[in-house]
Amino acid sequence: MLPLILDQLQEAGVRPDNVRLTCAIGLHRKNRRDEIVDYLGAEAVSRVPAGNIVNHDAEDPEWMVDLGRSTLGDIVQVNRAVIESDLTISIGHTAGNPYGGFSGGYKMPATGLTSWRSIASHHSPGTMYGNDFVPATTSSRFRDQLTAIGAKMETAMPRPFFSVDAVLDSRSRQLGVYAGSIPEVEQASWPLATARTDLRLDIEPADVLLIGIPRNFHYGAGMGSNPILMMQAIGSSVVRAKNAFVDKPIVIAASVCDGWFNRSEFPPYEEAYAMLQTCQRPADMRGHEERLATDPEWIYQYRHNFGYYPFHAFSMIYMGGIAREHTSAVYIAGAKEPSFARGMGARTTATVEEALHEATDILGHKPKVIAVPELSKPAFHLTATRS
């Protein structure tokens, strides 16, 4: 889509040096130059001056602007380029997502171009542990907060966001592309995204969710061995699949869980894990946010050494806490360092078979099991149609 947009901008008389490409990374690690070329394509990258292709930096004092609060009371601190550009074009996709039902729409700027304080307003226990966050849905306080933050940005912009979102299939092929204002694009893209994402199973609600967690996926290398990210993946799976299960299902996850945190990309995670061990439950981590999220060393790693922002660890812990709130037990099967799994509140077994045996004892009957071996790769949201 980017080459087509660059073509239209050129036809309209916009010079390349007046185009700025900002990777809306939010609190994720910054992309290296070769990664940006892989994402955007060498041809598109060559058409924009190198200095105009940047990562969002949530801690850059020259590029972050405080707009006050949204209509829902959330802090709105945003990348200055959004406010000062004549036109801001948001390019993304509408894909199934445990955070607010779908990616894209107002989720793009509200999470990708803001500060940790803005993101902490919704990636938090107060929102995520509400009764409308699970299962994944666009009808939630979380989604309302994203909309309010995006709308607040637009009050300070010369014109509203021009959004271009694609609906993708399970192999990342385009099923549809929608362009216009964000409300228009959300309204137009969500029906197709729902048809692609919602998978209705002709079964009774299941008792056990069985998932496999690879070492490397989604957030980066070590996601399946880093205990915080491992449990985040489990919480996300519960959000995606909750409608296919009994009220308090059991989760069995096969994971290497060897305690490799990948410190180079996730520098604050070991300290966050140690903090979690002093808490009774994940929500108690709220009391530690300010100290870790403002730590100069971790902020430096985010800004200059391609590390995740320190608050990112908290948002992952809170999603992992969904598993505690919405299941009767979580088993990690095959952990090489089981103490890390237990530190996240999970039970441990040597094998999946052993975990299934224990689940049978808990339930008092042979469990009905749904297996999702590739975890979130298909990005389906499951529903059991029989009562």
For each feature predicted by the language model, list its residue ranges:
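Extended hydrophobic packing segments that form well-structured cores
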Residues: Y318-S387
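Mobile "lid/hinge" segments at catalytic clefts and subdomain interfaces of large enzymes
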Residues: S90-G96, S103-A151, T155-F162
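An acidic, phosphate/nucleotide-engaging active-site surface
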Residues: K30-F102
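Membrane-embedded hairpin module used as a gating/binding unit in multi-pass transport
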Residues: V134-G220
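A short, acidic, amphipathic alpha-helical segment used as a generic capping/interface helix at domain edges
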Residues: E184, A188-R200, A233-K242, F306-R324, ...
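Structural motif
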Residues: I89-I91, D207-G212, I252, I370-A371
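Alpha/propeptide regions of enzymes that mature by internal proteolysis
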Residues: L2-L21, D38-V65, I182, D247-I250
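C-terminal catalytic subdomain
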Residues: G224, I228-Y331
